[in-house]
Amino acid sequence: LITFVMITSSIFSQQIANEIYNWDDPSIVGSTAYDNAYNECWGVTINNHEIAIIGSTEGTHFFDITNTSNISEVAFVEGAYTGPGVIHRDYHDFKGYLYAVCDEGSSSTLQIIDISNLPISVNVVYDSNNLFSKAHNIFIDTATAKLYSCASTNYAMDIYDLTNPTNPALIYSYDDVGHVHDAYVKNDTAYLNCGYDGFKIVDFNNSNIASNNNHVELAS
């Protein structure tokens, strides 16, 4: 019976895991820390095309995967910081723009990339460290047009208004914990991985952070 289960499981695994494409550029160096050349992935649908996005130590790569028998890299944006010092990038999209960050390098920036013309081309419309340089993770609450930047400044997490998608504006800094590793936010309710400080649920409703310059912790 055990042998049968193992064989059945093996056959089932082969049936559901069918590799349809592999891309690996040997010219892209791995990180010094972990030897990882690639670090993050994201996906969008633009102009009826399915686009896969992958981060590397060199920057951000865009692939048209609409036709799985003809997948190709259609665009590339070099990171502000590149090379073996890069371990981690992160992405999120909003209203036809891709927001890209890197967690390493003094020259890192927030990059905002216009992806509305994919799969033909992309265009970097913002590339600056005026708001922050490095960030471990970002999340965009699309319902409220807010970008949450984790561990990007002296604060655990910062919140930016994306009413103007190409000109983010800082509206609040959260500093109740030492570090926010990652976040998921829906309608201003943030579910936060706070590392050594555990898991927290926080309400960042505009009425709280604007008028009271405060937030409401719902659970921890």
Model-based region annotation:
Residues 13-220:
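Feature marking well-ordered beta-strand scaffolds used for ligand recognition
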